[in-house]
């Protein structure tokens, strides 16, 4: 929590402080305490050490424990923690907890303790700070153990469980989660609907633990139970966590569509909560779009459109653009120029599948005109190793997407040419029909006429050049497999030049 936030809380707290006393001495004393408190606040930024002494002097001015002493201790503890004076912070926090039973109201004390623990949690960034935070939680739980404040007990325990998750102390976390689950149940063992919000927070903690430990079986069961909770109005950040882990679970199962749906919901919830994790999850959303081989731009939705030009996401924007254009070289260039994309272990783990899809499509596009080529030819043009080129070609052959044979000794690939004779004959009949149609409508009719009657008509038949007649890819592929070659005739043509089939490339 920032200092500004703290000022706001203090301002709100001070609504409780207006008391009207008849004794002038008491009024003078209160004014002196109040002045000391606000003087300390004025110097806390420029001179925090002196401010701590001033804040700690406030409780001593009160005859009985009261609001001003409570506030002074709060401010001193936060400054001590910020300056790394952890033992002093723990000592004064122990003193602060003596105020909560009688000196201040229950609601005010609960709110203040919660805010204090949030401040400590957000400011912890090293092992000593974590140890201090754990002591704060322990002192809080001991202080409220014999009180009837179950709400604060639950909140503090959940914070402690979150600390153990961050420190990967899964044994401690599992015990604490089981204890909290029992606290959120009725006597018959069923979930208590009145504690649905706490229950979702527990599910979120467990789901994160099982996601980190790769226990997908338990993760899936908890994920489904969490989505069935209807008795709570959860914080959007909690739902963002649950959906993010659900998306990762679906990714591990290669269920790209469900993963995309969960990542989108996670992004939407993080965005609503103002969490910076929305940027990372948006990257995951882009990743699933590529894994789905979708042509839909993930930045076209109303929720994601504002982030399309965000510099933190620009690398992923360029990546999906290159992917959807089937531009393997642009795709590889984006990855090489933005190594931070692979800094996320989850993206690094799954981007290989996208890269392989890109290289597979690039190879199919590259070899389309040829009946014979070498592995080194592919390696050179796609910029991959010969081993990977052979691996991808083997996959295409086994998947019946390429009818070819690999000669490993010579490193040569020969595309088979006689696999579909019947279909080729049908294609030739279709070509004959096109020739007849051309004669009727253009040559013998009133339509456009070909002035260059001496121009070759292509593929050994009379009629127009078929490479200009709009042959589809399948037809062209069949003609390649039969060994036919298109040639541009006319002046200046060299043998083997022009559009069409190349029988060998080494």
Swiss-Prot record:
UniProt KW keywords: Cytoplasm, Nucleus, Signalosome
Region of interest (Disordered), ranges: 482-506
Keyword Cytoplasm: yes
PCI domain location: 252-420
One BP term from GO: protein deneddylation
Compartments where located: Cytoplasm; Nucleus
UniProt cross-references to InterPro entries, sorted A to Z: 26S_Proteasome/COP9_Components, PCI_dom, WH_DNA-bd_sf
Pfam families: PCI
Domain of life, source organism: Eukaryota
Comp. bias regions, Basic residues: 482-491
One GO CC annotation: COP9 signalosome
Family: Belongs to the CSN2 family.
Subunit structure: Component of the COP9 signalosome (CSN) complex.
Task of the protein: Component of the COP9 signalosome (CSN) complex that acts as an regulator of the ubiquitin (Ubl) conjugation pathway by mediating the deneddylation of the cullin subunit of SCF-type E3 ubiquitin-protein ligase complexes. The CSN complex seems to link protein degradation to sexual development. Required for fruit body formation.
PANTHER family: 26S PROTEASOME NON-ATPASE REGULATORY SUBUNIT 11/COP9 SIGNALOSOME COMPLEX SUBUNIT 2 (PTHR10678)
Protein name: COP9 signalosome complex subunit 2
Organism (species): Emericella nidulans (strain FGSC A4 / ATCC 38163 / CBS 112.46 / NRRL 194 / M139) (Aspergillus nidulans)
Gene: csnB
């Amino acid at each position: 929590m920032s200092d500004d936030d703290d000022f706001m809380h203090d301002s709100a707290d001070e609504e409780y402080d207006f008391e009207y006393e008849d004794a002038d001495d008491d009024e003078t004393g209160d004014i002196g305490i109040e002045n000391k408190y606000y003087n300390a606040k004025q110097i806390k930024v420029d001179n925090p050490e002196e401010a701590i002494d001033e804040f700690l002097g406030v409780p001593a001015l009160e005859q009985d424990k009261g609001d001003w002493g409570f506030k002074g201790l709060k401010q001193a503890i936060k400054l001590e923690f910020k300056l790394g004076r952890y033992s002093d912070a723990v000592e004064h926090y122990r003193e602060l907890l003596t105020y909560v039973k009688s000196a201040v109201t229950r609601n005010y004390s609960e709110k203040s303790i919660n805010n204090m623990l949030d401040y400590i949690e957000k400011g912890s960034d090293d092992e000593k700070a974590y140890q201090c935070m754990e002591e704060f939680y322990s002192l809080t739980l001991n202080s409220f153990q014999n009180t009837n404040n179950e709400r604060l007990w639950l909140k503090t325990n959940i914070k402690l469980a979150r600390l153990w998750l961050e420190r990967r102390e899964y044994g401690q976390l599992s015990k604490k989660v089981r204890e909290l689950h029992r606290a959120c149940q009725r006597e018959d063992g069923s979930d208590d609907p009145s504690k649905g919000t706490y229950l979702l927070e527990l599910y979120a903690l467990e789901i994160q633990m099982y996601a980190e430990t790769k226990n997908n079986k338990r993760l899936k069961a908890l994920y489904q139970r969490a989505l069935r909770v209807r008795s709570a109005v959860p914080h959007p950040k909690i739902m963002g966590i649950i959906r993010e882990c659900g998306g990762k679970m679906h990714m591990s199962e290669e269920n790209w569509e469900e993963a995309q749906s969960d990542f989108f919901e996670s992004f939407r919830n993080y965005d609503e909560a103002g969490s910076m994790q929305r940027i990372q999850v948006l990257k995951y959303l882009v990743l699933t779009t590529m894994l789905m081989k979708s042509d839909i731009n993930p930045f076209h939705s109303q929720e994601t459109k504002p982030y399309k030009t965000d510099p933190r996401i620009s690398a992923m924007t360029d990546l999906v653009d290159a992917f959807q254009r089937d531009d393997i070289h642009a795709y590889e260039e984006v990855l090489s120029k933005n190594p931070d994309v692979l800094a996320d272990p989850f993206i690094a783990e799954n981007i290989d599948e996208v890269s392989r899809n890109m290289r597979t499509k690039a190879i199919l596009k590259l070899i389309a005109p040829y009946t014979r080529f070498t592995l080194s030819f592919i390696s050179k043009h796609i910029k991959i190793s010969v081993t990977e080129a052979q691996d991808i070609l083997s996959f295409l052959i086994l998947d019946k997407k390429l009818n070819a044979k690999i000669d490993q000794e010579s490193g040569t690939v020969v595309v088979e040419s006689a696999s579909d004779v019947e279909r080729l004959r049908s294609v030739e009949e279709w070509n004959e029909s096109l020739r007849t149609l051309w004669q009727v409508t253009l040559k013998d009719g009133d339509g456009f006429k070909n002035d260059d009657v001496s121009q070759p008509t292509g593929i050994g038949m009379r009629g127009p050049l078929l490479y200009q007649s709009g042959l589809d890819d399948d037809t062209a592929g069949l003609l390649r497999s039969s060994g036919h070659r298109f040639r541009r005739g006319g002046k200046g043509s060299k043998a083997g030049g022009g559009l069409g089939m190349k029988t060998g490339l080494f």
